[in-house]
Amino acid sequence: MGSKYPRSLRCCLPLWAFGLQVTFILLFYFLIGQDPIQADHKFMAIYQVIQDLTLVAALGFGFLSSSFRRHGWSSVAFSFFMLALGVQGTILLDYFLNWVLDWNMIKNPFSPFLSIQRATISTLPLLISAGAVLGKVNLVQLAVMVLVEAMTFGAIRVADKKVFRIEDHIIMMYGHVFGAYFGLTVAWWLSKSLPRRRHENAQTEKVQMTTSSSLFAMLGTLFLWIFWPSINSALLEGTKKKNAVFNTYYALAVSTVTATSMSALSHPKGKINMVHIHNAVLAGGVAVGAPSCLISSPWIAMVLGLTAGLISIWGAKCPQVCLSDLLLNPSGIHYTFGLPGLLGALTYYCLHIIAESRPSNLWIVTQTITDVGALSFAMAMGMVTGLLTGCLLSVKVWRAPHAVKYFDDQAFWEFPHLAVEF
């Protein structure tokens, strides 16, 4: 019987990807000039942060999504492709945002080097959302998704800066929530057009983990765990940066212990589930992201890490409650990034009120309402644009894979040792 996989991407993929890359080169030629940074010490400090962020994006998220037994190559390579494409597009977008937010480009010149730092951290929501659709889409669809999501997140940044007056650090922390619900909405729409039983049967065998694939996913978790303090502190300075690093380590440590112990407790025979370790150990770092610079005592960060770990394990064990079963999301981004991100935002609001509250101080009330509005706006934009992106990716021109070819590397990669090609 012939393969049910759609026609070859030989024409569609090179034309789209190469044309997009040439367009980026031309835009860089006309818009991006020499970097104004002169001090070597400042250059090296920023470069170290960029290195950490790149390790998180390329190795951490790449290997984290490689746990599926027949989709390891595509998960790692496609995530890397999204990172490379997303950074270029976000740098160009950052140039236009810099012009929109600050028209005086002579007094405050655009710094491509600083933009690389912002662009790398801005691609993290893209990689988070990719966890919900990897294995169900091809590389052309991912490229389209990168462009739409990058522009949407750029619009959110403009709105948060100009309308809500939110700090860059908080905007980027909201990006975890935005990326999670954007990806979940896209995945929901893509699965909506398929019969439920057929979709589940197509995924049952291929989403299972093997020892080697699970080990690579654990390697990605370790990279994320080690360098997550760099994410939470990348856009902070001075004492706030130091507090963010310390508190992130505390929260990560506690969520790791919580995830391990609760995973054993939730199993009838006291065995640990590796999926819980992949995801729940990171929940503390995600939850502490927004309030990390406001936390003055380690115990607060540790309690937050404990709560985030419990929520993540609860989400993994009760998928119907956390919508994971409805959305058919085997990567678990909802209870790894979505719910812990919301917990972190709630904690940030509470700590902000406690730190700034004074008798008859209406400013803190107004600011809190504004912060809640900014988060709600990010979530709403994520779900609305995710729905539109799902509709766009469903168009047949992208030659999407059939459900029977979900989570299958053979649809995209050359395997010389196999006699039958797809």
From Swiss-Prot:
GO terms for biological process: ammonium homeostasis; ammonium transmembrane transport; erythrocyte development; multicellular organismal-level iron ion homeostasis. It is a multi-pass membrane protein. InterPro entries: Ammonium/urea_transptr, NH4_transpt_AmtB-like_dom, RhesusRHD. The keyword Cell inner membrane does not apply. The keyword Transmembrane applies. Palmitoylated. Keywords: Cell membrane, Lipoprotein, Membrane, Palmitate, Transmembrane, Transmembrane helix. One of its GO terms (cellular component) is plasma membrane. The chain crosses the membrane at residues 13-33, 43-63, 76-96, 113-135, 137-159, 170-190, 215-235, 244-266, 272-292, 294-314, 335-355, 372-392. This is Blood group Rh(D) polypeptide. It comes from Rattus norvegicus (Rat).
